[in-house]
Structure formats: structure tokens, C-alpha cells
């Protein structure tokens, strides 16, 4: 579908909120954004986000505002925080597309914008095609990078994988590329579920081997009896992870492994402590910039855990 017009959303944030905004945009499959320092206040940044006009109705834009407001802990009851405008496609798309480039992650994965032809030098890589709405950058977050880097050393062949907080579907796609026989993707935002389905279809031509679930993790696993996973991928914020760990334990089969990301380096010790308290064995910790990735394993024999809501 040809995109004629775009919404441009502009708002201001404290500079130290940039990481969390990038993380959430990546989670939702939104990759067309920029951050600019304010000349008069270097402690603040202006955020610009471009969204396809035809795909973002009033309800979608309102829901998106609520998501950002919740993250930034603001009350925009007077609707003055967010500024929406309509931008003609020819005013920006052509000039920004030239800045797109394939993004190599680790040694094996390549994130490729869907309209760019694959260069011969990357033909030996595992290609993850992404359609971010003709944006000017993948905005790949360190937490996603860390997960993919960890995944390239895992044999997913014939394995069952759970992706919690699937977002744009990058990790689900990577697991399937690695040979996973079944991928279950869970997210509590319908925009993210739509993005996961769309990008999975783009890579494989169908939605075979993928099951998506909309809702909170704890509710979804109870309702759908999701269990006996070989691997769980959990790229979400540490505060959310803490409340999920007992149920993640329950979802894993014996000797199953979980990869946690979305954790700041300052939070990793607390997460590790909770993992150990829940009978998960720490396997590895890696970091990139200010973010950490933690992998753990469910031992073959442990006390039974209940699922908590």
C-alpha cells in the first residue's frame, strides 16, 4: 500500500527518558523517530515520530498517547503535551530513505528494511526483514541487540519458544529462522501484535508456526495453558519482569532456558536475586551500553510452582 501522508507527533522529554522511549517504540514496531536537543535547555529533548496516516485513526493515536503518558508519568488532560501534524509524503520520505542501511547484529543476524536489496556480502547472514512503515532507521535498542546476540548461539531446531512482549516480532522471527517448530508471541498491546504478525508474514510468507496472544502474560498463560517451553524470550522492563518470574518458571520445561533483557545494569543484581529465589539457575550475564541481558535455566528437578495472578 502506497503511503500518501504521514502523521508527525512531537513532544518533549527529559534527556534521561530517551532510552525508555526508544525501547517502547521498538516494542511497538515503530521505527520512524528522531531525538533533538533543545538549544535553550540541554536537559530536554524533542521527540519526533512519523506514523502512516491511513494506519493511525483517532482511537489508535489516543491509545498511543496514553501509552507514552503512562511511561513518562504525565497527565495530559488538557491535551497540550502532544502535538500532531500531517506531513505530505514527498516532504520527507525520499530524503530520509537514503539513510536506511542493513543493520548487522552480532555475527549472524542482519536486520533488513524490506525495500532494500540484500548486498552479496551479507548473503551468509540470517536475514530479519522489517517493514517499519518506510521510516529512516530501525532504532534497534541495546536490549534487542543483546537478545539476538545471545540467540545466535542457541540451537532452536525443533524447539518450542515463548516470546513475551513480542513488539515488532524481531525475536520471534529470529527463533523461527533458527528452526523453532512453534513460536508463541504474547503482548498486551494490539499494535505490537499486529506488527508481530505483519513482520512474521513478511519473512516467511505465512503465519505457520506462529501463535499470537493479546493480553497480559499472567492472564494469557492461564487462559491458554501455555507451558512446556524449551525457551522463553523476555525483552521487557525490569519492573515488569520481577512479577513474571514465578510464572515464567512454570512455563518452562525441565532444563528449559529463559533470556531476560530490557534490564538496566543498575537493576541486574535485583533480578538475579529474584531468579535464584525462584529456583532458576543463573547461566550468563552480558551488557551493552547501560543495559543487561540475563539467561537462566530451570533445573531438571525443582519444587512445583503455582501460577500467580
Curated annotation (Swiss-Prot):
Keywords per UniProt: Cytoplasm, Methyltransferase, S-adenosyl-L-methionine, Transferase
A molecular function (GO) term: protein-lysine N-methyltransferase activity
Positions annotated to bind S-adenosyl-L-methionine: 144, 165, 187, 235
SUPFAM superfamilies assigned: S-adenosyl-L-methionine-dependent methyltransferases (SSF53335)
Subcellular location as annotated: Cytoplasm
InterPro entries: Ribosomal_L11_MeTrfase_PrmA (IPR050078), Ribosomal_PrmA_MeTrfase (IPR004498), SAM-dependent_MTases_sf (IPR029063)
A biological process term (GO) from this entry: methylation
EC number: 2.1.1.-
Top-level division of the source organism's lineage: Bacteria
Pfam families, alphabetized: PrmA
Catalytic activity: L-lysyl-[protein] + 3 S-adenosyl-L-methionine = N(6),N(6),N(6)-trimethyl-L-lysyl-[protein] + 3 S-adenosyl-L-homocysteine + 3 H(+)
Any one annotated GO CC term: cytoplasm
HAMAP family per record: Methyltr_PrmA
Record function comment: Methylates ribosomal protein L11.
Family statement: Belongs to the methyltransferase superfamily. PrmA family.
Family annotation (NCBIfam families): prmA (TIGR00406)
Protein name in UniProt: Ribosomal protein L11 methyltransferase
Amino acid at each position: 500500500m502506497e503511503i500518501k501522508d504521514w502523521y508527525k507527533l512531537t513532544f518533549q522529554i527529559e534527556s534521561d527518558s530517551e532510552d525508555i522511549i526508544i525501547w517502547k517504540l521498538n516494542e511497538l514496531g515503530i521505527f520512524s523517530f528522531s531525538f533533538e536537543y533543545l538549544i535553550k535547555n540541554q536537559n530536554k529533548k524533542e521527540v519526533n515520530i512519523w506514523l502512516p496516516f491511513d494506519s493511525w485513526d483517532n482511537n489508535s493515536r489516543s491509545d498511543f498517547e496514553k501509552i507514552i503518558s503512562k511511561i513518562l508519568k504525565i497527565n495530559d488532560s488538557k491535551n497540550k503535551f502532544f502535538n500532531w501534524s500531517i506531513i505530505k509524503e514527498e516532504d520527507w520520505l525520499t530524503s530520509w530513505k537514503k539513510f536506511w542501511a542493513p543493520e548487522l547484529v552480532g555475527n549472524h543476524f542482519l536486520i533488513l528494511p524490506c525495500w532494500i536489496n540484500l548486498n552479496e556480502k551479507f548473503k551468509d547472514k540470517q536475514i530479519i526483514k522489517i517493514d517499519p512503515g518506510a521510516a529512516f532507521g530501525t532504532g534497534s535498542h541495546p536490549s534487542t541487540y543483546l537478545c539476538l546476540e545471545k540467540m545466535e548461539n542457541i540451537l532452536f531446531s525443533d524447539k518450542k519458544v515463548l516470546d513475551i512482549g513480542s513488539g515488532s516480532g524481531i525475536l520471534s522471527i529470529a527463533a523461527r529462522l533458527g528452526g523453532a517448530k512453534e513460536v508463541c508471541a504474547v503482548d498486551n498491546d494490539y499494535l505490537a501484535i499486529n506488527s508481530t504478525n505483519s513482520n512474521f508474514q513478511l519473512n516467511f510468507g505465512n503465519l505457520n508456526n506462529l501463535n499470537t496472544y493479546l493480553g497480559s502474560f499472567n492472564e494469557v498463560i492461564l487462559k491458554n495453558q501455555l507451558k512446556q517451553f524449551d525457551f522463553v524470550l523476555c525483552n521487557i522492563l525490569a519492573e515488569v519482569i520481577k512479577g513474571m518470574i514465578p510464572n515464567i518458571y512454570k512455563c518452562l520445561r525441565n532444563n528449559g532456558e529463559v533470556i531476560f533483557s530490557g534490564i538496566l545494569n543498575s537493576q541486574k543484581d535485583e533480578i538475579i536475586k529474584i531468579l535464584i529465589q525462584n529456583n532458576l539457575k543463573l547461566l550468563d550475564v552480558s551488557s551493552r551500553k547501560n543495559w543487561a541481558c540475563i539467561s537462566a535455566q530451570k533445573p531438571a528437578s525443582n519444587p512445583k510452582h503455582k501460577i500467580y495472578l
